[in-house]
Amino acid sequence: MAPHSTRRRFALWTLLLLSGCTRGLLTTVGPDYVQPETAAAKTWQSEQPGVSEAHAAMPSDLRDWWLQFKDPDFFRFLTEAQRVSSSVADARARIETARVEMVTAMANGLPKLDTQVDMLKSRSTFGGPPFDWTRYQAGLQANWEIDLFGGISRQREAAEGNLASRHSAWHDARVSLAVEVANAYIDFRYCQALMQIAEKDVISRRESARLVDLAGVAGLRPPADVALAKASYADAEENLMRQQGLCDRSIKGLVALTGMTEIEVRYRLNQKPERQAQLPTPPPFRLKGLPAETLLQRPDVAAAEEQVAEASARIGVEEAKRYPRLSLTGNITPQLQTVSGMSAFSPYAAGAGAAATYFANTWSFGPTLTMPIFDAGKRLAEVEAARIQFEAAKTRFQSTVRTAVKEVEVALVRLKTAEERLPKTREALKGYEKNFTATDHLYRAGFGNLLELEQARRQTLVARRTVADLEQEQVLAWVALYRAAGGGWQDPEGGAPAIPVREDPHNPVTGQKAEDYKP
């Protein structure tokens, strides 16, 4: 019966110790994490996009949004930028660092086993012939810190929060970079559109200057009209040159973002004439779900929320240092010793030069209890510092949420304004173009005034630029809404390594929330 009773007690102790791998064996000090409430309103205050083909989407549904642009060159710029970006690489490195910390935290709650092998050889004399002594030793040392009060489990929770936060920051870096590349690409196509407007304006003014010059030579137009026509033509050429310089600057920006050569960037931008001066068409979507649900999927908001979870767990880590610590240690060390040339000392030696061999086996096992007695308030101060850090993390989270709400609402306003203004500006452009055509015909027939013609030309030029501006603003507003809603990035080569899902355990002993916790 005794052996069976011993085995039952051993199994019971093993189950109890293993149960402490996720919670403290006796209790888990410190607050249990509770997700902070967001100050977001119940509904979006700004009107959602009114596009009929827009589909309702959560941020997780937007991971292939860039692919729906159906612009291979644009998508190539995105993937190249992701590949060479230092900000994305730094974020990925921080993930790996957090993963190492996670492995360390997981290992702290498990037994540790080390081995040691050594050999020692010596020669001694005691006023007589020398004898040699050799020892061979191999040992196993084991140590297991028992998580009595949950300090180790809190370390694991903190590591999980840190890893999840780093992963969200990596995602945020990728989305931010994708938006930056998209804006640069859109700016270049917009610049090309303005270039086309400027080129048409140059052609129109050059023809007007030529006709006015011929009329002036024939004495049909005064010198003032000839000078004004030439000045107008020169002004159009200067505007075209300025616009060309702006487009070249946009290309430099794409080169810096993608790491591609300028020759390759220019080739991809100009290889298909049908895409030149054509803004990409973003797939429309409508935000689905409550603002709080949407915002919590933004990577920056998720990162801030995970930092709150980490800070909450750090309180328990520091609090556990104020309680006793229990460790189980043990070792097994077999030894083999040989002694030669010791006939005078060993009753087993047959004669001079004979050798004797001894075998010994030693072991030890026992608990070690470490109890803090006096530290001049150091541990209590560290708990208070951890609690302050938690409050700061919670404040940063609320600030991030407010910023996210603002960005979504502003993007919705931008989009709605652009959608409402575009039809009006296009209608105005048609009217100005008709007015310019009529004025030009009158002037060519000799019934108009050059000043009226130039005024009609300027009005048409301004209207064309206004339409181009609003078309760009509409595309940029869609990109801004995608970014503000926390849209994802579909990586064709795979994403970051998967991360463990942080648990939200309940402490039946303390039953405390982080905001209520006092050391």
Model-flagged regions — what are they?
Residues 152, 161, 168-290, 414, ...:
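Periplasmic alpha-helical coiled-coil/stalk elements that build and connect Gram-negative outer-membrane
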Residues 2-5, 9-83, 160, 244-296, ...:
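Terminal intrinsically disordered/low-complexity segments used for targeting and assembly
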Residues 328, 369, 386, 393, ...:
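Hydrophobic, well-ordered secondary-structure elements that form the walls
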Residues 89-90, 106-107, 146-174, 224, ...:
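Sec/SRP-type N-terminal targeting helices
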Residues 22-180, 326-330, 335, 360-366, ...:
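Short flexible linkers and secondary-structure junctions
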Residues 83-86, 406, 441:
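Surface-exposed, polar/charged faces of alpha-helical domains
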